[in-house]
Amino acid sequence: MDIAIIGSGMAGLAAARILKDAGHTITIFEALPGRGMDSHSIEFDGGIIDAPLRVMNPHLWKNTLSLAAHLGIKTFPVRTYMSCSWLFEDRTETWLTTSRSRIGNFPIINNRKGIQQYGWRLVKGMLQLKTAIHQFFKSKNQDITLAEFINQNDIEEVFWHGVVMPVLYTICTCNPKTIGDWPAKNLLEFLRHLTDGDMLLRMKGGTPAFVDSLIKGIDIHSGSAIKKVELQGEKVLVENEKGDQ
């Protein structure tokens, strides 16, 4: 069967690979130049910077990591350090840097300003968040948004807005209003593993290596948006602005 897939993000590429391996003929259409999933990855100093950040908790990224293993993509553990510069709207100076402990992989404040000016508030916020998450997963009312969760819990503002939310913005790549409307459960599960010190994984070669394996042997028409999706009898015509079908 000839199958068209619109979009080459994670969902589109995974579907394309699975259908290709099942014997179908696949064509991918992508509006952006190149491939959607790794279109913002940057080569720098002999390495690759993935944007958005592609670090995966093995408990939460089981399907992605299973697909990577199936394709022969190897992973390696990483310690995620932080540098926080967003706290007040009128200032963007770095106010906090962290590393990780050798035992337990827990975050450690390692700059003087972070310790002297905000240390207690950050420790307090961490304890408040861990307590709130623990209570959330013990409760029966887990069908709430992230905004509702934060409104129901007293968590130190500097910690929540200066540390936690920038991490979520980086992972989810969306604005505050959108992320506030997300179901809290999945995000809190992520934060629980993060604050517990779970080791995260990266793919060897970064996202581009993963994308290369996903699209191997598959035609992709990129750099042109879809202009027509039309039912023609028992088939569907897909055409982009360049006229590719």
Where are the model-predicted features located?
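N-terminal Rossmann-like FAD-binding beta1-loop-alpha1 element of flavoenzymes
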Residues: 2-28
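Glycine-rich FAD pyrophosphate-binding loop
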Residues: 20-44
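Residue-level detector of anion-binding/catalytic polar loops
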Residues: 25, 74, 220
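N-terminal glycine-rich dinucleotide-binding loop that anchors FAD/FMN and/or NAD(P) in oxidoreductases
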Residues: 41-65
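Mobile amphipathic helical/loop "lid" adjacent to a hydrophobic cofactor/ligand pocket
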Residues: 58, 62-180, 193
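Helical element adjacent to the flavin cofactor pocket in flavoenzyme catalytic cores
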Residues: 187-235, 240
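Core beta-strand elements of the Rossmann-like FAD/NAD(P) dinucleotide-binding domain
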Residues: 241-245
